[in-house]
């Protein structure tokens, strides 16, 4: 069994990205990321702080717009419009989830697709589905980079994804299909998840339920990717996989923490750099 070490890989990618950003800055373009945080959800606040620190490490200018939880949808859309028109902001990220009175789809659709570094705009989702270059959601992108770094070729492989969220499951399914995998997606209405996972070459779990994937659900030598992040009452972070029992049976497996999480952050940084490169290209055409 080999651990898919996202933490060490993310450090390597950050080092390379820092050099690329420095070269970009020397041409007069400093990548800029605007993060919108609505309310004071502890998990959301922690994620935003992690993103800000990561931006600082690689040389990306980042600014966080903290909004009260009672902000109206129209007020939030106005903030996004200002950022859409700010020439110093290359990427716009709205931290999810949003309060119940705000329609998430409307907010995400308001972001300029060329600044949608989260890859959640329908325009970018559509481009991903037809395998055209676009912004790819950070977590699925991080999963693919992690597999690639360990020379795990998904072409012709049977892949099962448990979870069909717009953030992870669906875009990951598109990426896997684009890479030549045969993909099945299990969700809350799937009657027998084990029936799908027991013969899969690669199993990706992104649900948010402790111990969802047990050892009897995978075949010997399967690759297991755990996207779940759950905090136990003791404060310990665990994923969706029964790691202790699944790991000995797998050929590769991601730990939690230290697997997919760091790759999500670094993929966001790469998307922001990509958006800044677009700005430079536009400037050079003038």
Swiss-Prot record:
- Quote the pathway field: One-carbon metabolism; tetrahydrofolate interconversion
Gene Ontology molecular functions: methenyltetrahydrofolate cyclohydrolase activity; methylenetetrahydrofolate dehydrogenase (NADP+) activity
What InterPro entries does the record point to?
Aminoacid_DH-like_N_sf, NAD(P)-bd_dom_sf, THF_DH/CycHdrlase, THF_DH/CycHdrlase_cat_dom, THF_DH/CycHdrlase_CS, THF_DH/CycHdrlase_NAD-bd_dom
| This protein's record includes keyword Amino-acid biosynthesis | yes
Task: Check the record and name the PANTHER family matching this protein.
Answer: C-1-TETRAHYDROFOLATE SYNTHASE, CYTOPLASMIC (PTHR48099:SF5), C-1-TETRAHYDROFOLATE SYNTHASE, CYTOPLASMIC-RELATED (PTHR48099)
**GO annotations of cellular component type:** cytosol
In its UniProt record, which GO terms are filed under biological process?
A: L-histidine biosynthetic process; methionine biosynthetic process; purine nucleotide biosynthetic process; tetrahydrofolate interconversion
**What function is annotated for this protein?**
Catalyzes the oxidation of 5,10-methylenetetrahydrofolate to 5,10-methenyltetrahydrofolate and then the hydrolysis of 5,10-methenyltetrahydrofolate to 10-formyltetrahydrofolate.
Provide the reaction this enzyme catalyses.
(6R)-5,10-methylene-5,6,7,8-tetrahydrofolate + NADP(+) = (6R)-5,10-methenyltetrahydrofolate + NADPH; (6R)-5,10-methenyltetrahydrofolate + H2O = (6R)-10-formyltetrahydrofolate + H(+)
* Residues reported to bind NADP(+): 163-165, 188, 229
Cite a single Pfam family from the UniProt record: THF_DHG_CYH
> Which HAMAP family does this chain map to?
THF_DHG_CYH
What PROSITE patterns has UniProt attached to this entry?
THF_DHG_CYH_1, THF_DHG_CYH_2
Q: EC number(s) of the enzyme?
A: 1.5.1.5, 3.5.4.9
UniProt xrefs under NCBIfam families: PRK10792.1, PRK14191.1
Q: What is this protein called?
A: Bifunctional protein FolD
Q: Which UniProt keywords apply?
A: Amino-acid biosynthesis, Histidine biosynthesis, Hydrolase, Methionine biosynthesis, Multifunctional enzyme, NADP, One-carbon metabolism, Oxidoreductase, Purine biosynthesis
Similarity field? Belongs to the tetrahydrofolate dehydrogenase/cyclohydrolase family.
How does this protein assemble? Homodimer.
């Amino acid at each position: 069994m080999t651990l898919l070490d996202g933490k060490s890989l993310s450090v390597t990618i950050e080092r390379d990205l820092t050099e690329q950003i420095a070269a970009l800055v020397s041409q007069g373009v400093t990548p800029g990321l605007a993060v919108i945080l609505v309310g004071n959800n502890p998990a959301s606040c922690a994620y935003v702080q992690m993103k800000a620190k990561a931006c600082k490490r690689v040389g990306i200018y980042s600014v966080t717009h903290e909004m009260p939880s009672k902000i109206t949808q129209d007020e939030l859309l106005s903030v996004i419009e200002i950022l859409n028109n700010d020439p110093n902001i290359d990427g716009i990220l709205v931290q999810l989830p949003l309060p119940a009175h705000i329609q998430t789809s409307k907010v995400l659709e308001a972001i300029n697709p060329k600044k949608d570094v989260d890859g959640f705009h329908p325009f970018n989702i559509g481009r991903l589905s037809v395998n055209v270059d676009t912004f790819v959601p950070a977590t699925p992108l991080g999963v693919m980079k992690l597999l690639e770094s360990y020379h795990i070729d998904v072409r012709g492989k049977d892949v099962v994804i448990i979870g069909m969220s717009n953030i992870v499951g669906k875009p990951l399914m598109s990426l896997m299909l684009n890479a030549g995998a045969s993909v099945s997606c299990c969700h809350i209405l799937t009657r027998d998840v084990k029936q799908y996972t027991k013969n899969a070459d690669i199993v990706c779990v992104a649900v948010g339920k402790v111990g969802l994937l047990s050892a009897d659900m995978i075949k010997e030598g399967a690759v297991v990717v755990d996207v779940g992040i759950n905090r136990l009452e003791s404060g310990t972070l665990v994923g969706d996989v029964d790691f202790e029992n699944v790991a000995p049976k797998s050929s590769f497996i991601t730990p939690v923490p230290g697997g997919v999480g760091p790759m999500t952050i670094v993929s966001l940084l790469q998307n922001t750099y990509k958006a800044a490169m677009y700005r430079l290209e536009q400037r050079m055409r003038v």
